Amino acid sequence: GLDSIQDYVKLPTNFGATIGRYGNRINQGKITIDGVEYQLPRNNYGHCLHGGSKGFDFRVFNAHQLSDQVLELSYLSKDGEEGFPGNLTCKVTFSLTDDNAIDIRYSAETDRTTVVNLTNHSYFNLDGDPSKDNSDYLLTINADAYTPVDSTFMTTGEIAPVENTDMDFRQPTAIGARINNDFIQLKYGKGYDHN
């Protein structure tokens, strides 16, 4: 980890953050709910990324330790926060299991129709040495398809097969083995940052 909370805030990667109200991008920052169009902050290539300029990664959650191995965080996102409609109460529960796995569970309640897509930006350096990168880590992803993006990193709506592409991690493959290849999706995503 980093030495201070200020070091985390300075990172552009949402390092370790809970992401919301809406993880990923909303095209042109526009949503329509019940016939009403809402304009959200356009904080990333003209799109709304991770809930806007002041998404959940910039909010202070209330912490409740439920047991030695369980921490629950809660937050009330008020109606209109970052342009989103409805009061949204969300909870994130972090549990450390007996076999040393981290289990993250999300729940949310709202008082009106809205959008919500919570996620987490945890990153792990399994070497324990922050000066080393992860390019030699073997990665397996049990997925036959991915969602391509355009040059503004917005998903195109296509669901593309991974077979015969640099996105194919169905067999253990070093993360860095193909990351510098001339595959347009690696250029658009600045590496592997796709669904």
Show the residue positions of the predicted features.
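An exposed, glycine/acidic-rich loop-and-rim segment of catalytic or binding clefts
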Residues: G1-N195
